[in-house]
């Protein structure tokens, strides 16, 4: 099991994603005007996928008897290689338990276009799989997108953006390469030696490659990247294709998976801990969760009726914006199938701007980013009010993926997963004993032990590490502080039933849950306790009033101090980004903490970041983002 800390990568200038356009040539083949080339063979596209990429990599024979197998592809296109691979995996009774595909695509199709081209070009035997692929197809946003099929046994990690920028930022242990993409004459960047070397660094010791392209400069670049290459008979009208085998002695990825499937101990039963436990349990790991709140007969987020999950955007698409975008996508895909009331409600968020100047700057930001309008768009005051179902003070932006979440119900559902057990205990100290980490209580008694321990205990994590003599190498974590805050429950009838979507800005107002609308929130520095009270309710009522264009008369009659609410703590780190990953100085210890006010945005993503690295999967985040969140 590896605890490598990823170095920060230099940020490339932001370039908006340019979707593919559906064009056919005179022979009815799908064609790219940008690259002057067709998407598939003149003969049989699925036949080429099987001949070149499956047989060329010795599949399905090479994957038999393995626990996992990972494929890396350049040029996803319309996805026929993926669908052919998926079908071959389904048809093989000796298939690996888990199959992962990592595929890069600079110009992805929109969902409707993808479905249309697959309906037109995929064989009848792949149509059912094509429908499943289109159903999960992500919005056209730059970065990595993780899709799951077959109950999570098959994953597809899509990298949307320039391959030469994404390739150096991938984490995986690749067993087979499908080198596809348009011809080098029209798309030289896809076959650039530096790009191929960036992919080759991911190769497992016995990795193979196959490509329809047999150009001499491509074969030479692959040889320089550490592969023994040869030509083989091509498919259809092509005389040759290229096959390759990783040369012995060449450096291989140091992200070796934790193959023994050892149990994992998670310290903390809040949102961070529940999400880590859930992600690991979905992969078949046995997980024990230590829940300190249960010692006092409490439940995490008890009384917290509802919270919002809204992405953020930035003109330079900075790490916080990228992580937020990835986190909101991951949360929806991970939680949408949970039973009610745990499943999020995708109601959207109207985020109001403070003034006309900020609104103009935001409009310019959206023009630069060129994100899909069905993901985020500008709205004026009337449009915002129509979306919210009540008058609002200003216009702003509408995030279609904004969600309403019931935190307590979500945590309960995550911890109820098969393979997860919970112990009511407080972790006072950690102690290394052989290959195990032992958790001790305040009396020095062992509470639990495991070879892998994930600290997801929010602002108590620095204290636990300090008392265990493990905090000194983590100066950023040592600066974590707890910030109190409260939300207030407003009767929905005082708000004409409440908004239909999340309304945010200077504060937020949420749609009704069980007759109450949550308004928030306060930030109390230096508090000894997290409490509700008249002053906090006054702040939240003022924030709610500032969001509303014309508050109903019943709202004006609400009195601070007379309303129910909930108070809690935020664990805040410098930079307000979370910390998730292994502790380099303490092998076997991992951290998932510092989620501040964005626990819902970070939880599912950080859980999958940790679980993917423990289980030898392609990473769901780029290495420059992993460096930003690495515990330090």
UniProtKB/Swiss-Prot annotation:
It holds the Pfam family DAO. One of its GO terms (biological process) is methylation. It catalyses: 5-aminomethyl-2-thiouridine(34) in tRNA + S-adenosyl-L-methionine = 5-methylaminomethyl-2-thiouridine(34) in tRNA + S-adenosyl-L-homocysteine + H(+). GO terms for cellular component: cytoplasm. Its cofactor is FAD. Residues 267-632 are annotated as: FAD-dependent cmnm(5)s(2)U34 oxidoreductase. It is found in: Cytoplasm. This is tRNA 5-methylaminomethyl-2-thiouridine biosynthesis bifunctional protein MnmC. It comes from Bordetella bronchiseptica (strain ATCC BAA-588 / NCTC 13252 / RB50). The gene is mnmC.
